[in-house]
Amino acid sequence: MRLAFLPLILILPTTHYAATPINGWYSGLFAGYAYIPSNVNKVNYNTRYTDATHKAGYLAGGNLGYKSNPLRYEAELSYFNANVAHFSQNNIRQDNVGGYNNGISGMANIYYDFSGIVSCLEPYLGFGIGYAWLREQLNNLTSNTQTNFRINSSAFAYQGLAGITYNFAENYAINIGYRYIRTPNMFSFGTTFQSHFAVLGVSYRFDDARYK
């Protein structure tokens, strides 16, 4: 029975000494896992490219924001990349392939931080709008049908975000979250772009004198 309470005993001292989050300016860095579904449905020189699936990718970026509890306002810049696993040409799957899907997004986000049972833990929800610059490179490496197809495009983008922040010091916090980004239908890709991210981030708050 005593062992059952051991995790709680270990957590309580940590949360007791953790800090209440403060209002003011902050900046942060984040990185994580990217899952990019198929986002190409395009005909090029009588060849249709579809079903471009990708290997596990990554996301990295930074942000600058202002917290006015319970809201946060933030500008964000991020880069993501995932290599191509396979794609189809004229509905025939191609497995001997190369290529990638990458992009840069600049977003303006707004968050709502929920006060938790423990003051240092804050679940959050967020929404952002901005612009994304995207590139898809599809290379068929089979010798008798070798092709290279590249798409470059940019579009309005929006995203939803959710996660939890742990304020382990008055000026520092870490957060773990999920985000989903999407664009409207893009002519160059023949469909919408969308991606899922699992993200770990760290933030530094500049103004250590302005408490909630």
Pin down the residues of each PLM region.
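Membrane-embedded beta-strands that build the outer-membrane beta-barrel scaffold
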Residues: 27-31, 62-64, 73-77, 110, ...
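Cleavable N-terminal export/targeting peptides
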Residues: 1-23, 207-212
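Short glycine/proline- and aromatic-enriched beta-strand/turn motifs that initiate or cap beta-hairpins
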Residues: 17-65, 201-209
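Predominantly the C-terminal beta-signal and adjacent terminal strand-loop region
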Residues: 78, 82-88, 160, 165-212
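Flexible, solvent-exposed loop segments that connect beta-strands
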Residues: 38-52, 78-103, 131-156, 185-191
